[in-house]
A protein has these predicted regions:
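Hydrophobic/small residue at the entry helix of a nucleotide-binding pocket
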Residues: 33
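Conserved SAM/SAH-binding loop
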Residues: 98-106
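Glycine-rich phosphate-binding loop and adjoining beta1-alpha1-beta2 segment
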Residues: 46, 51-89
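N-terminal charged helix/coil linker that caps or initiates catalytic domains
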Residues: 1-26
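Short, well-ordered coil/turn residues at beta-beta hairpins
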Residues: 120-121, 144
Length: 246
């Protein structure tokens, strides 16, 4: 047994470690939620990871994203995350796709089989498209709902999308998925009522087909999206390792 995973084996067993090492997991979105999900998956022993994000590290990411350091400003988030994971587990196979997910170009993002997909995309259209693609290909997926404008990480829960409440993003997702005939989707969502930002802020984004546009971002803090990402990873690890919570 590899020393770096011996403590993990005490919880999930050697058979669980073997399953994780053989698994190929895709993380869509390497931001405040996705960066923590990706690193937790790597530290748990997932052997093959595909990281999808077309964004570069910005100063506004420093308050919450694992990839954000002064030394990484301006660099590709996916590339920074890949280097970080390889420094944690040099044996891991890490691929990156530095592009924005669009359903009409799904083939670029689904090269080879995925055992699980983590949806940490922060646009409704992207999330809907990814869920539909995963369902079409019968790939397990867990999706993050809204983590912005919140201060209480203890309010996160894992539930089916149709059992969610409070979260505005989950409300939109319920409506859109129902209209498309999707019967179930595992999500991580918060029951905390979103706070109204104390002031408005505009920032450039590259999330519309790779073209920059101005948007109003939500308020964020270090200890909320990170927890959502860790919960996403926990769902994936338990299911891939064949574990259940008592």
């Amino acid at each position: 047994m590899e020393e770096r995973f011996c403590r993990t084996a005490m919880l999930i067993g050697e058979a669980g470690l073997v399953r994780l090492k053989a698994a190929r997991v895709a993380v869509f979105g390497i931001g405040g939620v996705g960066s923590f999900a990706a690193e937790a998956l790597a530290r748990a022993g997932v052997g093959r990871l595909v990281l999808i994000d077309n964004d570069a590290v910005a100063a506004s990411n420093l308050n919450r994203q694992l990839v954000a350091l002064y030394s990484t400003l301006g660099r590709s988030k996916a590339a920074v995350m890949k280097a970080r994971i390889e420094d944690i587990n040099p044996a891991a196979e890490v691929e990156i796709v530095e592009d924005f997910f669009l359903p009409e170009r799904a083939g670029l993002f689904f090269r080879g089989h995925y055992d699980y997909i983590v949806d940490a995309i922060d646009t409704v259209a992207g999330k809907i498209g990814l869920v539909m693609e995963a369902k079409k290909r019968t790939i397990p997926i867990v999706s993050s709902m809204g983590a912005g404008n919140k201060l209480d990480p203890t309010k996160f829960e894992v539930a089916d999308i149709y059992e969610t409440s409070v979260c505005p993003l989950a409300r939109v997702m319920r409506r859109e998925l129902k209209s498309r005939g999707v019967e179930a989707l595992k999500v991580v969502y918060s029951k905390e009522k979103p706070r109204k930002p104390l002031f408005a802020l505009r920032e450039e984004s590259a999330e519309k087909g790779g073209q920059a546009f101005s948007k109003q971002p939500p308020g964020s803090i270090s200890f909320v999206p990170s927890v959502a990402g860790l919960i996403l990873a926990s769902v994936v690890v338990r299911e891939l390792a064949g574990l259940t919570l008592e």
